[in-house]
């Protein structure tokens, strides 16, 4: 749903995951918007998951729904111990459990080897170029990250941070208060 169509939904963020040089970084902005009002500027939408923090995850969408998905995904990760298997098992549940079908959120998850998007329809998508960008500023961040990867020697963490900053300059639902995690 377009954020402007329902002013009562908490929405809009930008999350990006970038791989370079054997490292992966996931970054997100800190803005939470309700309707046309910024409610919070320093939300933490990127977290480490798993027993040893071996998976990075970021969310876009309704905050309460995203926290529910974080919890469910982490339970699957603890049970299966492997990112792809946990994502597929969560996606199966998302498609079959009635309460999950109504959740309005996307997850971007990454470990040392794999990056995945878990979509609101229960799809699990692996990007072909190792970059994930979701949320209202996702297209801007994706474009910035691709350009920085192609034309600089910057590391994954710096590219992810700069991509969020560029998106924050363009997208009104994204700010420059960046939280970034790296493996």
UniProtKB/Swiss-Prot annotation:
Keywords: Allosteric enzyme, Cytoplasm, Hydrolase, Metal-binding, Protease, Sodium, Threonine protease. It is found in: Cytoplasm. The keyword Cytoplasm applies. It catalyses: ATP-dependent cleavage of peptide bonds with broad specificity. GO terms for biological process: proteolysis involved in protein catabolic process. It is an enzyme of class 3 (hydrolase). Na(+) binds at residues 168, 171, 174. Its EC number is 3.4.25.2. Allosterically activated by HslU binding. The active site is at 13. InterPro entries: ATP-dep_Prtase_HsIV_su, Ntn_hydrolases_N, Proteasome_sua/b, Proteasome_suB-type. GO terms for molecular function: metal ion binding; threonine-type endopeptidase activity. Its main location: cytoplasm. It comes from the Bacteria. NCBIfam families: ATP_dep_HslV, PRK05456.1. Belongs to the peptidase T1B family. HslV subfamily. Protease subunit of a proteasome-like degradation complex believed to be a general protein degrading machinery. A double ring-shaped homohexamer of HslV is capped on each side by a ring-shaped HslU homohexamer. The assembly of the HslU/HslV complex is dependent on binding of ATP. This is ATP-dependent protease subunit HslV. It comes from Xanthomonas oryzae pv. oryzae (strain MAFF 311018).
